[in-house]
Amino acid sequence: MEIVKSKNDLFRIIDHADQKHTSKILLFMILGTIFLDAYDITILGTMTDQLTKQFHLSPTMLSVVMTSLPIGALFGAILGGSLAHKFGRKRILSVSLLILVITSLGASLAPNLFILLTCRFIMGFAIGMDSPVAFTFIAEISNKWQKGRNVNYWQVVWYVAIVVSALVVIAFFVMGTGEHLWRFAVGFGAFIALVLYILRIKYLKESPTWIINHHSLEEATEYVRNNYDVNLKLEGNGTSFSENKSSKPSTTELFKPKYLKRIVLATSISTLQGMQYYGVGLYIPIIATYIISKDKLGVLLGTAIVNIAGIIGAYVGSQLTYKVGTRCLTMIGFSLVLIAMVMTGVFYHSLPMIINTFFIALFLFGHSGGPGTQGKTIAALSFPTYLRSQATGFVESVSRTGSIIGTFVFPIILAAVGLTNTMLILAIVPLVGLIITTALRWEAVGKNVEDE
């Protein structure tokens, strides 16, 4: 029997809980939220040729279309953390899914460019709210030994979603959807969102740490007793630091000396990884036309196959998080990405297709196992519960500027200077990331931030 005298005792109990009690929630959280976000964000990357043709887009206007979602995500991320702190994680996650159902359908049926841009912007807003809350939720339902690994699983699911999105497009392509291919593919996201919304409403429970912070000690104890299958005996009046901090914290607390290095490191990694991924990884289908094939089916198959490297890298990174640490994995990842981009930029014209494809795969492997995962993980693991949603929301919102820049500049630079020079120009991003991560020494894994 566990004795509960304060909310600190409840935090200790869930921090040491058997992982089997959270596996179902993790399944819905990771395989649901992250999968859908990745699908919606990347699906248009396979359709740039059709979008350009149907809406008569210049390289700049293509950049505007592709950037509309990340811009919406920036605004959503600004609000997501605060709303999740006030109303709970589950409500925000459910509302965002409902918005994605409506806007995915709207985008797929868009009769003109204005409607498409509007729907994609609102989709981005929902994803921006959804993503930081998802990472917070995963960290809060995982025990102390598995937080890093479980949070990092999001990147595995991200690349699974990219591969699946390419296969979905191939399926619709084979069905003969013709010029409406992009509409079917975008609309399919509404179906995924609807299924997840129904499952989430039926099965998903509120974050235990949010319950502990926002409910009485008696109510929180009952929640933990029922959901973690532990025998608890309540003693004492339940006063603790947790109850005093249940009101909305100020974002300025993130910049106090204790947390400054952590928030700068997490924000820098997340912003730079967003810039390098959205500036290169999002446009793998376009890069594939240079390296793999000019044929539409060949491009889609190549996109699906090369992104398997992302799945492998993300899985390896998640398994090594506790052993190697988030910072070391980030430095390794930035190094691999830098090598891949420089080699492609310098030797693209003189190397065979298989070697050039390998370097693109190396880019995805290094990114997914390193900075692509670790920035958000550091944000989720480096702060106590009362600050966590604020931290993940702040990191997510600032990092969206990197996503916006990367998404916007690639088509323009590519049209102006070609693939090799584009890769060399963008290689400065992982170089800067490597320098910053080397300079800022903070390791989030294994730290008990609740007791600081």
What are these regions (language model features)?
Residues 1-452:
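Transmembrane-helix signature of 12-pass secondary carriers
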